[in-house]
Design a protein with these regions (language model features):
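Glycine/proline-rich active-site loop of Rossmann-fold NAD(P)-dependent oxidoreductases
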Residues: 168-175, 202-211
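SDR active-site strand-loop-helix element
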Residues: 6, 30, 73-74, 108-114, ...
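Conserved beta-loop-beta element that borders a ligand/cofactor-binding pocket
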Residues: 146-168
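N-terminal Rossmann NAD(P)H-binding glycine-rich loop of SDR-like oxidoreductase domains
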Residues: 3-25
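Non-catalytic, hydrophobic alpha-helical segments
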Residues: 12, 70, 145, 159, ...
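Substrate-positioning beta->alpha
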Residues: 141, 186-200, 211
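Conserved Rossmann-fold NAD(P)-dependent oxidoreductase catalytic core, especially the SDR/UDP-sugar
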Residues: 26-28, 34, 91-137
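NAD(P)H-binding glycine-rich loop region in Rossmannoid oxidoreductase-like domains
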Residues: 35-95, 99-102, 203-207
Length: 214
């Protein structure tokens, strides 16, 4: 499978990229800093590092050409300003979806977060407070960005992991259709390594397009 990865140098993104390469997939990492990507990921016969900005529609479309799936593991820096108010995804996601789908990619996996949008209906009271107070700026940005790309929904799979940790993964991670989730206790946490596994599982099945997962 040919995978275009956005956010390949992030803490979750590089884990995903390594796992995809270990499974024998061909990966194109579209990155702002190619030197950082090479240092972090190393050279690999199935890895192509393409430098480019997320707002460079022409370059992103070129990188998307011939890919089976796009996986976005983008995230903004956790600064006080971002927590209060953010437009990071609103400014980028519409451009990304237009460029990628315009190049013929029919499956786009987006890493979102548990508690974003309608997923908050299944959250516990403590988790709802986290979503509406602590993470308000970032989560509101994601919701507004999603509203800007509804025309691409048939192509999109969203993953909604809980609070990410840097602990070793447990393995054997399962993904669930978000529509089947009724209630989750406490504040869910998951290792980034397990999230990377889940994202790859979702990406490998094109029939997952149009479905949200937990």
């Amino acid at each position: 499978m040919k995978i275009l990865v956005l956010g390949a140098t992030g803490r979750t993104g590089y884990l995903f990229t390594r796992k995809a390469l270990e499974e024998g997939h061909t990966v194109t990492a579209y990155v702002r800093n190619p030197d950082k990507a090479l240092t972090l990921l190393g050279a690999h016969q199935n890895l192509t590092i393409v430098p480019g900005a997320l707002n460079d529609a022409e370059q992103l479309a070129a990188a998307s050409s011939g890919q089976d799936v796009m996986v976005s593991i983008l995230g903004q820096k956790a600064t006080v300003r971002e927590f209060l108010s953010s437009t990071f995804m609103q400014e980028r996601l519409p451009l990304i979806m237009e460029a990628v789908t315009g190049a013929g990619v029919k499956h786009c996996v987006l890493m979102s977060a548990y508690g974003v949008g309608d997923t908050v209906r299944t959250a516990s009271l403590p988790m709802r407070l986290v979503c509406k107070v602590i993470m308000r700026g970032i989560f509101t940005d994601k919701v507004k960005a999603d509203a800007l790309v509804t025309e691409y929904q048939p192509y999109i799979s969203r993953a909604h992991p809980g609070r990410l940790t840097d602990k070793p993964g447990k393995g054997g991670v399962k993904v669930f259709d978000m529509a089947s989730v009724k209630r989750t206790p406490g504040i869910p946490t998951i290792a980034r390594e397990d999230v990377a596994d889940a994202l790859l599982t979702i990406a490998k099945n094109p029939q997952n397009a149009g479905t949200d997962f937990w």
